[in-house]
Amino acid sequence: MSPANIYRFFASKTEIHQTLCLRMLGASYQQALEIAHLPLSASERLRRYALGQHKLTVETMLDEQKVHEMVVVAIERDWHVIEKHISRLDDLLAGIIREGIEAGEFADVDPAVAARCFGASLVTLCHPQIVAQCLAKENRATPDELVEFAIRALKK
């Protein structure tokens, strides 16, 4: 599609970035929602969630470089959209953690606080700019190491 055709659907470049960012965030949330409803232990769902988010970020960055760049621009311009996305993910994670507490898998903590801490501890796996800078570094924890560390922090 030519640039002229694109602007028949979008009023500006900013609108293109916003739409792309919303689409990526929607895909991220949908993946998280599907994982949250799997009939697995809370630990396994958290593991799949974190590694899935990382994989989605890496695949976008490597396979769709232009999309990755547009998402980064949208993140910088529309942080309020990212805040809403983080809150939705935190709520989803809190539900998984609550189920893990009820099953005796995790320590008895505030699920909302635990979800925020879990998500924050794994930001290097899903923030596009951080992933881009750290992907090939050998002196960083691997995604598996980070996820296992974060899950162990929730256990009794």
What annotation goes with each model-predicted range?
Residues M1-E15, T19:
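Helix-turn-helix
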Residues I6, Q18-C21, V67, V71-V72:
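Feature detects amphipathic, helix-rich regulatory segments
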Residues E15-H37, E44, R48-K55, E59, ...:
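Alpha-helical structural segments
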Residues I35-A36, L51-V58, H68-V73, A150-L154:
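Helix-loop "lid/cap" segments that line or gate small-molecule binding pockets
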Residues S41-R45, D110-V113:
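A conserved beta-strand->loop->alpha-helix hinge within the catalytic CA
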Residues K55-E59, D90, G95, E99, ...:
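Amphipathic C-terminal alpha-helical segment
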Residues Q65-V72, W79, E83, I101-V147:
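Hydrophobic/aromatic-rich alpha-helical bundle segments in the mid-to-C-terminal region
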